[in-house]
């Protein structure tokens, strides 16, 4: 299947996140919402300046939809589907209870690089199942023949891929890793070191940090071969559906990103490898409420009933700073020095996607915050306002 589409009535369960402020009176619910009014109005005033129709020409004051336009030709084109987006929306949970929501929080929109963190969670599922017992083992040891066999790539470990220090070299479904060399992103505090797309000299794996979507897609391919099952199926059935989510969820690949696996039953299957974002189209479409469910599940320890789906040690490791990039963990942004995300605590972590997608786990307030389609230039103002509201709640 090119993607998974789940349309079903949601079942209530003990694990489903509450959709009301405190399951109390309307007056109390309104009081909860009023606490966050300033932050919500601020977010809604600063929608990302992208057209809502990804195929439409930008209006005055807007920029083209997506990030592929900044790539050198011929890589500056979409390779997978994109779809209409909604407006600014979001959800706030505190202690597992929804205390604020705005916009269309049940609308499933593409979330760009928030999907990277979902790949780290899938690697955690593989670890819990014994498929990935040692993240410091070279990837080629378990999945040979898919691009890790060269002299340079054979020393790359799973940990290198998860922290974006792999320096993997090659082409993944027609995209060369060079297209994202010298890439800079908004939350990387370092100055640009070169021109995006230039053939930067490679370093030893583990010694150089670079935000590179082709290498993330190579991690996704490796996880596909490790599970021997399409990653959207694993994510949906293992993580999202047990939380009561999944309506409208889909995880789509590029039009030509098909490969053959032998599944657990020994049957050959032609399946689609999915990207860890929407840089060239495809990727995860998911609602703000489902993103909040996932973040709250992470914050509270990664269990579903009696099953430890992802170990607490794995989740803690995701939030540990990379030795050479302390602003980053395992496909997660960090705030250990307090400067990358002013207003958030130094223990906070963020999943971030282009187009203004932020999923913020805030241990200091036992909270998770999701905002979609916020102009990233105004993310600091939003974070500061939400932090102030949480401190009063």
Residue ranges, per PLM feature:
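Active-site SXXK
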Residues: 96, 110-135, 161, 219-223, ...
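Catalytic-site signature segments of enzymes, centered on catalytic residues
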Residues: 97-103, 111, 172-256, 282
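Active-site Gly/Thr loop motif
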Residues: 259-278, 319-369
């Amino acid at each position: 299947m090119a993607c998974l589409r789940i349309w079903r009535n949601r079942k209530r369960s003990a694990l489903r996140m509450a959709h009301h402020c405190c399951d109390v009176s309307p007056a109390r619910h309104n009081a909860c919402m009023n606490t966050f009014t300033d932050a919500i109005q601020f977010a809604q005033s600063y929608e990302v300046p992208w057209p809502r129709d990804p195929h439409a020409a930008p209006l005055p004051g807007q920029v083209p939809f997506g990030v592929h336009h900044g790539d050198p030709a011929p890589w500056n084109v979409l390779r997978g589907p994109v779809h209409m987006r909604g407006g600014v929306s979001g959800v706030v949970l505190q202690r597992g209870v929804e205390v604020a929501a705005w916009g269309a929080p049940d609308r499933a929109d593409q979330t760009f690089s928030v999907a990277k963190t979902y790949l780290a969670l899938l690697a955690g599922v593989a670890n819990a199942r014994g498929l990935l017992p040692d993240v410091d083992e070279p990837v080629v040891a378990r999945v040979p023949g898919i691009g890790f066999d060269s002299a340079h790539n054979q020393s790359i470990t799973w940990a290198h891929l998860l922290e974006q220090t792999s320096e993997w070299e090659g082409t993944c479904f027609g995209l060369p890793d060079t297209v994202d060399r010298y890439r800079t992103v908004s939350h990387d505090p370092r100055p640009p070191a070169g021109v995006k797309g230039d053939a930067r000299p490679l370093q030893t794996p583990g010694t150089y940090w670079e935000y590179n979507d082709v290498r993330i897609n190579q991690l996704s391919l490796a996880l596909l071969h490790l599970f021997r099952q399409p990653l959207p199926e694993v994510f949906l059935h293992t993580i999202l559906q047990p939380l009561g989510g999944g309506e409208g969820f889909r995880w789509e690949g590029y039009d030509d990103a098909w490969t053959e696996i032998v599944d657990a039953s020994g049957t050959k299957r032609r399946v689609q490898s999915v990207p860890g974002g929407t840089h060239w189209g495809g990727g995860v479409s998911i609602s703000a409420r489902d993103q909040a469910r996932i973040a709250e599940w992470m914050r509270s320890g990664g269990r579903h009933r009696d099953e430890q789906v992802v170990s607490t040690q794995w989740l803690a490791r995701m939030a540990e700073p990379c030795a050479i990039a302390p602003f980053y963990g395992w496909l997660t942004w960090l705030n250990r020095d307090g400067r990358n995300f002013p207003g958030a605590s130094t223990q906070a972590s963020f999943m971030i996607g282009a187009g203004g997608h932020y999923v913020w786990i805030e241990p200091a307030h036992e909270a998770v915050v999701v905002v979609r389609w916020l102009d990233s230039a105004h993310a600091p103002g939003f974070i500061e306002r939400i932090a102030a509201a949480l401190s009063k709640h």
